[in-house]
Amino acid sequence: MNYMRTAVLLAGLTALFMVVGFAIGGKGGMMVALLVAAGMNLFSYWYADKIVLGMYGAREVDMRTAPEFVAMVAELARRAELPMPKVYIIDNPQPNAFATGRNPQNAAVAATTGLLQTLNPDEVAGVMAHELAHVKHHDTLTMTITASIAGAISMLANFGLFFGGGNRESNNPFGGISAILMAILAPIAAMVVQMAISRSREYEADRGGAEICGQPLALASALAKIAGGAHAVPNYAAEANPATAHMFIINPLSGARMDNLFSTHPNTENRIAALEDLARQMGGYRPAPARAAPARGPWGGNTGGTRRGPWG
């Protein structure tokens, strides 16, 4: 199902890429865009996860550098019957997290230092279980490729404003006007595609994550805290790369941008209500939280030296 959705998504974004190419350079531009899109689709499949992690300066951690956090992810992955993903930490004060990778065998999960410092252990476990649910559902392939291609569409459309608007070839009857329109409409269209695949997927990952960690209310509490932090603490890397916003557990954009009018996430209050309903259905089912024995800190390394982590 997710592979079919990914194929449809790639076809749609490739078609949009070609439309932008036609607006910039007529039929020749459209053919060039087709070739570029084909190359991008292949490149995105293999390398988009590394690009996204690089955008946010994520650093990989292990049992030596972040023993408690990595042990928590390992236990959650065991419960989810998943291979152990790579674990990353992003030095960013906004509490947030995402997962990436083309399949469960090549997956990675990333959390910000803000998340590790803001949430308690049960809430962190709920968030990471949510991200592992994305991995289990193969959502990470769709999310990562969407981020890569949607960002390229926006870049190409803006490029057309400066270099394509003057094209007056007979095979492009719309000329500079179409380049201007594409610069405005293409990023919006790409964002609409992101919205179409994101909303139901988040509900599914919330439910799957709650079942993995066994604590729906801990995840609900985490969502409330993350949403408050996302509004209060700007994420400048996300503001510079809005095409990746749909990858995070909560929209990282501050709301000052037009992008936030086209939210890639369902309403947080609705997600919390759904988790509360799930908690009532699960009744007294509360397995022990996924945490390791006390150690020197949940993520290790030096995050500034001024604050201890929730388990340190």
Swiss-Prot record:
Its cofactor is Zn(2+). Residues 287-297 have a biased composition (Low complexity). InterPro entries: HtpX_protease, Pept_M48_protease_HtpX, Peptidase_M48. Residues 287-312 are annotated as: Disordered. Keywords: Cell inner membrane, Cell membrane, Hydrolase, Membrane, Metal-binding, Metalloprotease, Protease, Transmembrane, Transmembrane helix, Zinc. Zn(2+) binds at H130, H134, E202. It is found in: Cell inner membrane. Pfam families: Peptidase_M48. Its EC number is 3.4.24.-. It is an enzyme of class 3 (hydrolase). Residues 298-312 have a biased composition (Gly residues). One of its GO terms (cellular component) is plasma membrane. Binds 1 zinc ion per subunit. The active site is at E131. Belongs to the peptidase M48B family. This is Protease HtpX homolog. It comes from Azorhizobium caulinodans (strain ATCC 43989 / DSM 5975 / JCM 20966 / LMG 6465 / NBRC 14845 / NCIMB 13405 / ORS 571).
